[in-house]
Amino acid sequence: MQIEVFEEASPLGAEDVTAGLRAHLIAKTAVLPLIPLTVLLRDEDDRVLGGIRGQVALCWLQVDHFWVDDALRGQGHGSRLLDRAENAARMHGAIGAHLTTSTFQAEGFYRKQGYAEIGRLRDRPPGHDRIWMSKRWG
């Protein structure tokens, strides 16, 4: 047996780790769909000025990436994007949403949207915290 360390995103064998984990999850939870979800904000020239990327997995919306162009922040676009993503996830049977943010990012925004802190990692990066948040629909 040998252990290898790679400093690249998708070395040969990386997909085997994902497939193995998926097989384990299915064995423990039954077959649950993994539904990719992308919501985009475009201008009249079709340029993307914001959006959300994530997935509906294990009955929850997982928000992986959320961005709104600096010039458009504070105008309600982020709230509209998040609302659309949450509604799309509900259509696929999601019971809530979860995400991570940082103290230098959008913690206050998410709290206004009804998200609550469920965990915190201090000093990631030093001087800032990484925050896990969730919102259960009901």
Say what each PLM segment does:
Residues 72-73, 96, 109:
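Acidic/histidine-enriched, beta-strand-rich ligand/metal-binding domains
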Residues 72, 76-84:
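Conserved acetyl-CoA pyrophosphate-binding loop and the N-cap/start of the following alpha-helix
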Residues 98-100, 116-132:
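Conserved catalytic-core motifs of GNAT/GCN5-like acyltransferases
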Residues 89-102:
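Conserved GNAT acetyl-CoA-binding A-motif
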Residues 3-64, 69, 104, 119, ...:
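Acetyl-CoA-dependent GNAT
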